[in-house]
Amino acid sequence: TGFIYEGKQEFEVISNRVDSLPALPMKIMMNVGNPDRAFDFARLPNEGVGLARLEFIINRMIGIHPKALLEFNQQDAALQEEINEMIAGYESPVEFYIARLVEGIASIGSAFYPKKVIVRMSDFKSNEYANLVGGDRYEPEEENPMLGFRGASRYISESFRDCFALECEAIKRVRNDMGLKNVEVMIPFVRTVKEAEQVVGLLAEQGLERGKDGLRVIMMCEVPSNALLADQFLEHFDGFSIGSNDLTQLTLGLDRDSGIISHLFDERDQAVKILLSMAIKAAKAKGAYIGICGQGPSDHADFAGWLVEQGIDTVSLNPDTVIDTWLYLAEAHG
């Protein structure tokens, strides 16, 4: 449903020349999830992709739980029939999953080549994985999936390692077979330094060794422990990309999806800023990459300005906010 307005509505047209935008003290990157729009978004002024979400590709282009494909022969006849209809034309269920991931990642990687494209490995929560075809057979029922079986904990678990291996295979094909070495890896929701060590080791086992062929492995800085122990986490990664959404929720102890307390959600809260400053300073001291890909800078230009003052390397924005935020930062900090 929509709205019907009586009479001719007034509107304003704002034109900007994107080929002559003023210089900035940091780089503007973009958050891109939809491979179908990648070449459109690449026409905007940018320094690459600070966040490419695998979840969008899995949801939009695959729609099937990876375990249901790995264990296709063990599924009941009804599920096999449903899956067969979805994977028609592919060599095998597993090849369907990998090939579709490759298609999505390569679309974004090639659209922005040779600029960096940081691909975040899947960050579905258990309830989101359960919504995929066959997913309800494999996912636990959790009271609070936000704090549950996700991120690095999921990758290194015995029950999901073979699923994570499919994502790694897709990244390898994009980088090695297609030559898109601009595609880099990002790991979300790393709770402890031990997990950091384990997940980087697992990547190496899967053929994605940090530093080999120029591969950078970035970590999402989105758990308070990441900022508090930034020096230790950075021993295992080439830098941080701050996820301000989860970091804010976990710092303030709130669920931003709760209508009762959602008004308290603000990335500009002083407690959040203290953690952000700690992470930025630690990365700068080590000469490591430090960027942000959370929603905050897209929603609040003044927050983006504050991040610039802290010395952040890159701010990754939603495509529809790139021009306005660029102009704001140029005026305030150019």
Question: Where do the language-model regions lie?
Answer:
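Conformationally flexible catalytic loops at phosphate/diphosphate-handling active centers
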Residues: T1-G2
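Beta-strand/loop-dominated core regions that host nucleotide or nucleotide-derived cofactor-binding catalytic loops
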Residues: K8-Q9
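Conserved alpha/beta-domain cores
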Residues: S15-G334
